[in-house]
């Protein structure tokens, strides 16, 4: 039997079982757990390669073959780290397994035919597109920025650079919701809009959900009182939608205990649960210990560095319409930025007590940095805390990698009722797929696939004789244009909105998908991130303890996935 060295094999077909891959320039390594391909029967496209007529390509017609196959990719998802061929059919993931020609090859589960396109995944990491569940829709250019970073679903609220949107993630009222749904059809991005949830009576909230909101947002700038919390959650229970909350920093209408009591055990997504982005000072972080609370972070505090505190004070003054000449406004800002709780947030992510990471786009957050800041946090925690218990003795960081990737894929999908469509690499889901060269993992995708069509990619000079000459930068591809754009992305709304035929009312062309199971999801469902510690915060020193353990760490002075990759 002929043999090939591991190095030569990896260079040709990508890593296989037992091989380790470094994630960008971090201290994180993942190890291949399983290989669905068959040694000696791998398929690869190119001159003199396997996928040719009568060889790796069969005569099967399109009813038996996928539209696209991604060959020999290393899948990194919450459920595993495996090598496989991935098939896409009608915009969805149709199979994960072994591609080829069953007429001459054994073990084929994905038949390649003359109607099949090929994307080379050899040596690349394949992940699900990120879900950013904390978006201020301040400008449409955010969507392109997010897409080019690897985000394929954006959930939040807003109407553009209105003063309300600059501070809060709410799209208030039927007219605004309709306009945002109409505008959204121009983008290769799944979108969902949160209505304004701040009201003590249900009428206005019912209207917004029936008009196309996928959920509701409670924000302190609109008055997040116990009465509005209770009413909003009551409405959400009736419509099976999620509620996101930014709690009362000033403790004007109650303390964190009053807010938790107002939840009455009902599920809620707490934004920036550490508190720098807003929330009961100094102890909103306690909320992560509740079984009905789905806690997330926003990315400016990820991870804790020597620059974090200084940067936040300036951001806060702008985003919340504060005046540095008014002492009360300055005191408000100072109360929200606490190095002790930000440091604890790092550790709570590593323990799996904080379940999600999002951006808070242009409103104390960077829309294109959800992914890289998640992995920077994972790196910092490995350097400072060592291997997780689940990774001890394995020589790799597989469990930590699964924990962190879940924070921006499957967990926000579960939290907002969209996991039946997006959030993981699983058969039947939308083919929202990101490919990464390992050296650029989490920083610069090599290909962004949206609903089965290539929507964006780094591309060279269009007038060059080959695709690679400079200037190479991210450009929209065919999947981001025309009807293809509308047919490869979806808008998430409530079931009540679909029942009300808003597609006809607003003359929408792209598919509307109802969110579901929003009210039954709990912290226990947060994949690899379900820890519910007993939380304590010292009101004077701001020291944070989880199950009696003091949570503290030093700020990072240097991070990976940073200036090495970016000129600006």
UniProtKB/Swiss-Prot annotation:
GO terms for molecular function: nickel cation binding; urease activity. Ni(2+) 2 binds at residues 217, 246, 272. GO terms for cellular component: cytoplasm. The keyword Cytoplasm applies. The modification N6-carboxylysine is found at residue 217. It catalyses: urea + 2 H2O + H(+) = hydrogencarbonate + 2 NH4(+). Belongs to the metallo-dependent hydrolases superfamily. Urease alpha subunit family. SUPFAM superfamilies: Composite domain of metallo-dependent hydrolases, Metallo-dependent hydrolases. NCBIfam families: PRK13206.1 (NF009685), PRK13207.1 (NF009686), urease_alph (TIGR01792). Its cofactor is Ni cation. One of its GO terms (biological process) is urea catabolic process. Pathway: Nitrogen metabolism; urea degradation; CO(2) and NH(3) from urea (urease route): step 1/1. Heterotrimer of UreA (gamma), UreB (beta) and UreC (alpha) subunits. Three heterotrimers associate to form the active enzyme. It is found in: Cytoplasm. This is Urease subunit alpha. The active site is at residue 320. Residues 129-568 form the Urease domain. Binds 2 nickel ions per subunit. Keywords: Cytoplasm, Hydrolase, Metal-binding, Nickel. Carboxylation allows a single lysine to coordinate two nickel ions. Its EC number is 3.5.1.5. Gene3D superfamilies: Metal-dependent hydrolases (3.20.20.140), Urease, subunit C, domain 1 (2.30.40.10). Substrate binds at residue 219. CDD domains: Urease_alpha (cd00375). Pfam families: Amidohydro_1, Urease_alpha. Ni(2+) 1 binds at residues 134, 136, 217, 360.
């Amino acid at each position: 039997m002929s043999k090939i060295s591991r190095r030569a094999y990896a260079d040709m077909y990508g890593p296989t079982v037992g091989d380790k891959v470094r994630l960008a320039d971090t201290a994180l390594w993942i190890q291949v757990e399983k290989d669905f391909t068959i040694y000696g029967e791998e398929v690869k496209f190119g001159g003199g390669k396997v996928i040719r007529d009568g060889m790796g390509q069969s005569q099967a017609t399109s009813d038996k073959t996928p539209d696209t196959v991604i060959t020999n990719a290393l899948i990194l998802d919450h459920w595993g780290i495996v090598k496989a061929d991935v098939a896409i059919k009608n915009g969805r993931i149709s199979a994960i397994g072994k591609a080829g020609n069953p007429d001459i090859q054994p073990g084929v589960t994905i038949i390649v035919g003359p109607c099949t396109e090929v994307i080379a995944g050899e040596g690349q990491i394949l992940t699900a597109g990120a879900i950013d569940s904390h978006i201020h829709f301040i400008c449409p250019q955010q969507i392109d920025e997010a897409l080019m970073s690897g985000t394929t679903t954006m959930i939040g609220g807003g109407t553009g650079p209105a003063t309300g949107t600059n501070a809060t993630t709410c799209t208030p009222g039927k007219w605004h919701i309709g306009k945002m749904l109409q505008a959204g059809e121009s983008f290769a991005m799944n979108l969902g809009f949160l209505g304004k949830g701040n009201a003590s009576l249900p009428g206005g909230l019912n209207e917004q959900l029936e008009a196309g909101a996928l959920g509701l947002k409670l924000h302190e700038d609109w008055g997040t009182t116990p009465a509005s919390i209770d009413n909003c959650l009551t409405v959400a229970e009736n419509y099976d939608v999620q509620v996101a909350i930014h709690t009362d920093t000033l403790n004007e209408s109650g303390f964190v205990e009053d807010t938790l009591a107002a939840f009455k055990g009902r599920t809620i997504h707490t934004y920036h649960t550490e508190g720098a982005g807003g929330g009961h000072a100094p102890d909103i972080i306690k909320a992560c210990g509740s079984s009905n609370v789905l806690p997330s972070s926003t990315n400016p505090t990820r991870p804790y560095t020597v620059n974090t505190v200084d940067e936040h004070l300036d951001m806060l003054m702008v985003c919340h319409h504060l005046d540095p000449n008014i002492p009360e406004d300055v005191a408000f800002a100072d109360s929200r930025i606490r190095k002790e709780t930000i440091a604890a947030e790092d550790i709570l992510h590593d323990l799996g007590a904080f379940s999600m990471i999002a951006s808070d786009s242009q409103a104390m957050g960077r829309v294109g940095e959800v992914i890289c800041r998640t992995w920077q946090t994972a790196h910092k925690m490995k350097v400072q805390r060592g291997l997780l218990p689940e990774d001890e003795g394995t020589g790799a960081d597989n469990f930590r990698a699964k924990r962190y990737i879940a924070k921006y894929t499957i967990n926000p999908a579960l939290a907002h009722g969209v996991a039946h469509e997006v959030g993981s690499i699983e058969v039947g889901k939308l083919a929202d797929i990101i490919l990464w060269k390992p050296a650029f993992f989490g920083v610069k995708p090599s290909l962004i696939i949206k609903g089965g069509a290539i929507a964006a990619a780094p591309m060279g000079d269009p007038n060059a004789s080959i695709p690679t000459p400079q200037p190479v930068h991210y450009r929209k591809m065919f999947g981001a244009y025309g009807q293809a754009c509308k047919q490869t992305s979806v808008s998430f709304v409530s079931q009540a909105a679909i029942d009300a035929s808003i597609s006809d009312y607003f003359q929408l062309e792209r598919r509307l998908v109802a969110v579901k199971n929003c009210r039954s999801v709990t912290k226990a469902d947060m994949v690899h991130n379900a820890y519910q510690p007993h939380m304590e915060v010292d009101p004077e020193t701001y020291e944070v303890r989880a199950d009696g353990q003091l949570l503290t760490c030093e700020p990072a002075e240097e991070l990976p996935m940073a200036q090495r990759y970016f000129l600006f």
